[in-house]
Amino acid sequence: MAKTNSYKKVIAGTMTAAMVAGVVSPVAAAGKSFPDVPAGHWAEDSINYLVDKGAIVGKPDGTYGPTESIDRASAAVIFTKILNLPVDENAQPSFKDAKNLWSSKYIAAVEKAGVVKGDGKDNFYPEGKIDRASFASMLVGAYNLKEKVDGTLVTKFDDLRGHWGEEKANILVNLGISVGTGGKWEPNKSVSRAEAAQFIALTDKKYAKPENSDAKVTNVAATEPTQLTLTGTGLNKLTAEDVTLEGNKAIALEASKDGKSAVVTLSGKIAPNKELPVKVKGNTFIVKYVYEVKKLRVEQLTFDDDRADQAVVFKLNDEKGNADIEYLDIAGHDVKFVANNLDGTPANIFEGGTAESTTGKLAVGIAEGKYKVEVQVTKRGGITVSNTGIIEVKNLDAEATAIKDVVFAVDTDKAGVNYAKPLSGTDFTLNSKTLVAGEKAGIHKVVAQINKENKVVDPSAISLKSSNPGVISVKNGEIKAEAAGSATLTVKVGDVTKTFDFVVKTDTRKLTTVKANPDQLKVVDGKELPVTFVTTDQYGDPFGANSGAIKEVFPQTGVVKVLDVTTTNEGSIGTSSIKVKGENVGAGTIHFQNPNASGEGYGSLHVEVTKSNIGHEAPRLELVSKAGQKGEAADTTLGAGNTVAYQLSNYTTEGVYADAADLAGYEFRVGNDKIASAKIEGKTLKVTGKTAGVTDVILTKDGATAGHATITVTQENIQITSVKFKDVEVEQFENRKVNIDRVLDVVKSDKDDVLNGIKLNISTEHKVRIVDEGTEQGKVYLDRNDNATFDGNDVALGYVTAVKSNDTVSKEGNDLFKFLTDETATNKNDVFKGVTTAFGDKGTVIFKVMKDRVAPTTEYGTKAVTINVIKEEI
């Protein structure tokens, strides 16, 4: 059967290291030579290399079959051998075309391990062949070759331009693994066994993961709360993946040059005074971490005189982070803070008006000045370690240095806009800076930087004025759109200002877009899943759609029969979470249209309904907002005063979300109830942030843990303040890559790349990273837990996007011709691929760093790259 490009991508995604290992037949094991691979054969050295490595299989008749193609079933067998996956002799894969075959147990093994996927229609195509583009993609993934690329990728072969495998093939060319065939690359040509051997051998010689069979670990010790130290030999051949431990994860391993010791960094802290099994290469070591305080240093900081939730900070030993009093308590240590005035008399600066404290939390309303604070850490029944530092107290409230964020809202009921609390009635926040003539608006919130912290400004400290009262007038903080035109609004707090360019239109707001998140829903028949619907007008602002404003056109498959999208809830106009029920097994798309005769489309939602088949796994603790997104972290960050909801989710044996478990009989525990509180309501566990900090929430039943989440409560609004772009010149030559690397300093990583040149409104040692692939490609975030992956503890900062200018011209078939002039939530340009210049290109590619990728008014900075490769008529 002929393969489509989509099918080719499936092949590429199913095997990440095919033919790197395997079982050598008796004939192959006897020697390197095969009768059909004569001396001097162009692939002889590569075939011999893989024979030596035990990575290829000779045929029963003793031949190699260099001209034969590789099928997917054979690759599944090899992949199983590579990863030493457990093989169940009676196992059958879920793919309907891969059952009861000689290779079924191997296909089942790689499917269970998450290595392979089908075509989305329960097919695996075990006899399907692999083309060169798919094989290139396979090699790039198996050896992480994208990270090895030096410089900009260039498309040297015309038959690669616009092909789905262009980038992967270019990586092989860049690294010298492939040189093409007779001036072409032939991406659609099937790969022969000889070609496969050549590809793999060249790649393996350069980039194979070091063999760690010689590594021998003799001891594992916990040397810090988040650090293990290994001793032995050959440890420089280990990676973090070789170290596993329950309830924690090894995220980095750094070995000494002689390989006799290695330091392993963990993602979380080790529980003190408890035995912990640590596995290294299958061997188990019992580690018991006894926490000892050897050094202590009080941080000399400046505090505000009347701010709540401030505390003295100190560091222990040589640890990077601040000391954790809760962890010290678990480790058997008591902490005591003693404050004195500089003359030695007691200073009652702690909570409760005392001079001594066990938490270090400061009182509200402290006299300005300097104080000596001694911190004493005493091991119960043991010694005390102490240190004294000087802290200073000032009035920092009025010292705003910058306005970081201003939120405007439309006052639809002419009753004023609520400040720093939920909006009332049908008022809505503005995404754009557009008003319609006659509308009234107001400031919903202003956040200013005060002593390097972001605080919501008291409304009495804000002043507002308009540059053009004939277009937009301002009176007592009330904004009114008087007439069509433009005006600049200036917001002032203290001595700092921030300006906003507004336009006033005369076109009445109307519904233009309905976006569903997720826009592809997978649900069990008879069950419901929440979908967030966002409705916006022609200006990109929230639009409250009432019942009847949207015509839901249901698919004939009957997967969904009832849905009424309305977004008029008070406080969240334009956004609503609505449960969608799966009715019949099958798939189909719900289209959202104008109910009037024009019937223009607003958006769509694709729904796949699967049969009910509840599995026997323990339910998973998930955020209600992410119910059904199996694998999403339960950890989250929320602002003080905000609430998040959790549930225990049941899944089918196929991994499809079924429903929420009943929480009757469950209990919860909050690690620090001063940071957050929790309560169970029906099937929901609700957690509310109280004060800034980090704590754990644990759900239990009959004493056993049923779920766990780490909650980070913050009172800050971290955001980008400026972007440093590279200097760029006009691109006048063909085959030049214009992508994110052209304009921004991107440092490659095995996970999410580091993005340099992004300045934030806070001082931090954490890296700013960017997601380089997947649905969230281009997302910029602060990697707070330093694991190079965006999860619940990290802070989303915005996106890097790229579009071409409207006046750009290009020849059909060129990258620039296909590049979008405008992005939508579902149709985006690939900023990492960018465009490769070609004859006929003339125009501009504009790279933007934005808070909201589909809201042009939220940009933090832009850089334009001019392209002029006109050498022939278009």
From Swiss-Prot:
Family annotation (Pfam families): SLH
Signal peptide positions on this chain: 1-30
Main location: secreted
GO cellular component, one term: S-layer
InterPro entries to which the protein is assigned, alphabetical: Cell_Envelope_Struct_Comp, SLH_dom
Keywords: Cell wall, Repeat, S-layer, Secreted, Signal
UniProt key word Transmembrane: no
Positions of the SLH domain: 31-93, 94-151, 152-214
Intracellular or extracellular location(s): Secreted, Cell wall, S-layer
Superkingdom to which the source organism belongs: Bacteria
PANTHER family: OUTER MEMBRANE PROTEIN ALPHA (PTHR43308:SF1), OUTER MEMBRANE PROTEIN ALPHA-RELATED (PTHR43308)
Biological role stated in the UniProt entry: The S-layer is a paracrystalline mono-layered assembly of proteins which coat the surface of bacteria.
Listed name of the protein: S-layer protein
Organism (species): Bacillus licheniformis
Organism placement in taxonomy: Bacteria, Bacillati, Bacillota, Bacilli, Bacillales
